[in-house]
Amino acid sequence: MSVYVLALFIGVVAGLRAMIAPAAVSWAARLGWLPLQGTPLAFFGFTATPYIFTVLAVIELVTDQLPETPSRKVPLQFGARIVLGALSGAAISGAHGGLAGGSIVGVLGAVVGAVGAVIGTLGGAKVRSSLANMFGRDAPAALIEDVVGIVAAALIVVSMHGF
């Protein structure tokens, strides 16, 4: 599978749940499946990074269930998803095409990751709204979205092993 397809998919995950994408990427980097050493994104592989992103992802999963949580489409939420999708996409594509020296591969991965985040944000909101209408409440739809995001991120990370 192309690194750009993986970058797009991790961007979609960021659109669904902003912190799951960098958590997955940081675990891949920490496990040595994503060679980011010596690149500007090497921090993804630092010892504490996967734990920090995982804690943030769990907090996001919990707070998403709260009724006072703002829409993912408000500028701050939307912007964060785009930035995290871009960073995650750059890490995936750049690790396999060389990020050192500002490689175009990492830049293209960032763009593709950002596009994926927009797709995931808008598409995820639409699907969740439809599911919530079908179930008559939001909680089951949110849980389905959580599972889809986690499983997709895990599949993306596993597909990078031995890439």
Short names for language-model regions:
Residues A42-V55, S103-I119:
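Structural signature of hydrophobic alpha-helical transmembrane segments
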Residues V83-A95, G109-K126:
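Mid-bilayer segments of alpha-helical transmembrane spans in multi-pass integral membrane proteins
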Residues S129-V148:
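Interfacial loop-to-transmembrane junctions
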Residues F9-A29, G149-L155:
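The first (N-terminal) embedded transmembrane alpha-helix
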Residues E60, A80-G89, E145-I150:
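Core segments of transmembrane alpha-helices
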Residues V58-V74, L122-M134:
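C-terminal ends of transmembrane helices
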Residues R72-V83, D138-A142:
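Cytoplasmic-side transmembrane-helix entry/capping segments in multi-pass membrane proteins
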Residues A154-F163:
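Juxtamembrane boundary at the C-terminal end of a transmembrane helix
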